[in-house]
Regions:
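Low-complexity, acidic/polar, glycine-enriched regions of mature
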Residues: 14-186
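Sec-dependent signal peptide recognition
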Residues: 1-4
Length: 186
């Protein structure tokens, strides 16, 4: 009986590719960007995300597909949120979504350490690779299904995506990406 329960509730799937649905209540693409040429850092996040992760542990492959709703951009400051959504910056009326598609690569000890992919932001698509700083799968204690989580890091130049606000005033264009994601087995 105990063996049957262990098999039934084993949180790891080793035999075939498994699809995980991104949990929007536990996934936050966050970023840090320069304010006024080094005066301070502004931090923000995207509050509304959706997508899937496919993980094939046996063959050490996988993919990521994430959609971010730019209306949900949040700096924790109403005026900055308004500015970020305007046509000066993200122009969310013209570009309501950003997306990221990538491949999980460089598996070590059974887990991926990098995502090689493309970010589409502000209508422009560029190669953006993400480093996976932490990755773990386990049995979700409430849903009794496998859940995987990761902490990812990367960097972009926002002017590469046509977002040049502040450049003429000396604002630095580099943006640090800090992404926390959790996804539940489908």
């Amino acid at each position: 009986m105990m063996v049957a329960l262990l098999v039934l509730f084993t949180p790891f799937s080793f035999g075939k590719p498994v699809t995980y649905v991104i949990d929007p209540s536990h996934t936050f693409p966050a970023f840090e960007a320069d304010h006024m040429g080094g005066l301070s850092l502004w931090r923000g996040k995207i509050n509304s995300t959706s997508g899937e992760i496919i993980l094939d542990k046996k063959n050490k492959t996988g993919s990521v597909n994430v959609v971010m709703e730019m209306l949900s951009i949040d700096f924790g400051h109403d005026e900055m949120n308004k500015r970020a959504k305007s046509d000066d910056m993200f122009d969310i009326e013209e570009f309501p979504q950003a997306s990221y598609e990538g491949k999980l690569i460089n598996f070590q000890d059974g887990v991926p350490t990098k995502v090689e992919g493309e970010l589409t932001l502000h209508g422009i698509t560029k190669n953006v690779d993400l480093e996976i700083k932490a990755f773990k799968c386990r049995l979700h204690p409430f849903k009794l299904r496998e859940v995987c989580g990761a902490d990812l890091r990367g960097n972009i130049m926002r002017d590469d995506f046509g977002i040049k606000y502040g450049k003429m005033l000396g604002f630095k264009m580099g943006v640090a990406l800090r992404i926390g994601v959790e996804a539940i087995k489908k």
